[in-house]
Design a protein with these regions (language model features):
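Intrinsically disordered, low-complexity segments enriched in Gly and acidic/Ser/Thr residues
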Residues: 236-288
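Active-site/acyl-donor-binding loops of N-acyltransferases
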Residues: 2-11, 149-175, 287-358
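Conserved acetyl-CoA-binding loop-helix of GNAT-fold acetyltransferases
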Residues: 104-123, 144, 148, 265-281
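Short, structured motif recognition centered on aromatic/hydrophobic residues
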Residues: 69-70, 82, 92-96, 116-121, ...
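DNA polymerase sliding clamps and clamp-related checkpoint/processivity subunits
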Residues: 84-88
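Conserved acetyl-CoA binding element of GNAT-fold acetyltransferases
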Residues: 89-108, 251-267
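Conserved GNAT acetyl-CoA-binding A-motif
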Residues: 124-136, 282-293
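Amide-forming acyltransferase catalytic core, primarily the GNAT-like/NAT-type
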Residues: 2-82, 148-253
């Protein structure tokens, strides 16, 4: 039977810190806590969380992949929440999304964040083998708590905003977007194009990260949506993916567009990417772009194109794969007698044939 987030508060000694699943009663205090504008979002979260909890009661394979939501309260005040959802279709890796509702320092913050994340880890499916979470690189206290819980940094990404997103600047006049090169084609992300994009997604991750997230190419379909797709280069014989855009959830709960490319810089991108991003900005002027922090050529291209870095985020992971693999490991050394025993004949030796004259 699948694990379920039970409504059992976690009490800390000497204070009224509680961690429990999101309930309708929590929504009543949003207005008094200055979170009235978030009420519609919390209502959607509550509905999705209830669906996920009901699904956990149903035997057999899961029906839905809705997030399970836990909230942390201090003296009845909502301080933080965490969403927990499957990160792949095997349910072996889960994504945690932590959101602090009371920014700044308050009594018991570190203790409550740790208890909230611990309960989130305990409440995932029994098939869970790993967990990932995104965190702003400047949130030292969150990072310290995550390291205490066994999370390790796996990837650093840079978040970009376009130059026209600056409210202090006058709005840019409408213009005709730059066309793609004639040998390039933009195709939406779907079942046909996901296998073409898959090698680029794999190239963007280390082998350790690939083992932790345990994804297959159909998992890319969960990152599809408006403005996502694959940039294909027509070589005359076949179409080859040279870049892609996928939907990516950020540390603050918002969504950006992640740009994927191969490890080696492809000179065809120097012409194709500016045209692609220009078309993207025409359709979505306030888009937020996500890239690998270590991708210097891409960073240079974006800076030249007027993009500005906002911040850096870390993708951290915690895995049980290594422990399971170690328990199944075969010893590399064997006693000498055992090795020699395998060389001993199992039957009496056959007589050597005579080569003499008859």
């Amino acid at each position: 039977m699948k694990s379920l987030l039970l409504s059992v508060p976690v009490e800390s000694s000497g204070s009224s810190l509680r961690v429990e699943p999101l309930r309708a009663a929590h929504l009543h205090g949003l207005q008094t806590e200055g979170l009235g504008d978030d009420l519609p979002r919390f209502q959607r979260l509550l509905l999705r969380s209830l669906v996920a909890r009901l699904d956990g009661l149903w035997p057999g394979e899961p029906i839905t992949r809705q997030p399970r939501v836990l909230v942390a309260l201090e003296q009845g005040i909502l301080r933080a929440l965490v969403q927990v959802r499957p990160y792949n279709r095997q349910w072996s890796c889960w994504l945690l999304s932590l959101e602090e509702l009371s920014p700044g320092q308050w009594v018991g913050r570190r203790q409550l964040l740790k208890a909230l994340l611990q309960q989130a880890l305990l409440g995932t499916d029994v098939r869970s083998r790993s967990w990932v979470i995104r965190c702003d690189s400047s949130c030292d206290e969150q990072l310290d708590v995550l390291r205490e819980l066994g999370f390790q940094p796996l990837k650093t990404q840079r978040i970009w905003r376009p130059g026209n997103a600056d409210a202090s600047q006058p709005a840019a006049l409408p213009h005709t977007p730059t066309p793609l090169p004639t040998t390039c084609q933009w195709s939406p992300l779907n079942r046909r194009t996901a296998p073409l994009l898959w090698p680029l997604e794999q190239a963007a991750s280390s082998s350790h990260l690939r083992q932790i997230i345990d994804r297959r190419y159909p998992d890319l379909l969960d990152q599809s949506g408006r403005h996502t797709g694959v940039l294909l280069w027509d070589s005359g014989e076949a179409s080859v993916a040279i870049a892609g855009l996928v939907r990516q959830e950020l540390a603050d709960g918002s969504f950006g567009i992640e740009l994927l490319r191969d490890v080696a810089w492809d000179e065809r991108l120097s012409q194709a990417l500016p045209a692609l991003l220009d078309q993207l900005l025409t359709q979505r002027p306030a888009v937020v772009l996500v890239t690998d922090q270590a991708d210097s050529p891409l960073s240079q291209l974006l800076t030249t194109g007027g993009w500005h870095p906002l911040r850096e985020e870390l993708l951290l992971g915690r895995s049980l794969w290594r422990q399971h693999g170690r328990s199944r490991a075969v010893p590399l050394t064997h006693p000498l007698d055992t090795m020699l025993g395998r060389l001993q004949p199992q039957h009496p030796p056959l007589p050597t044939p005579s080569l003499g004259r008859r």
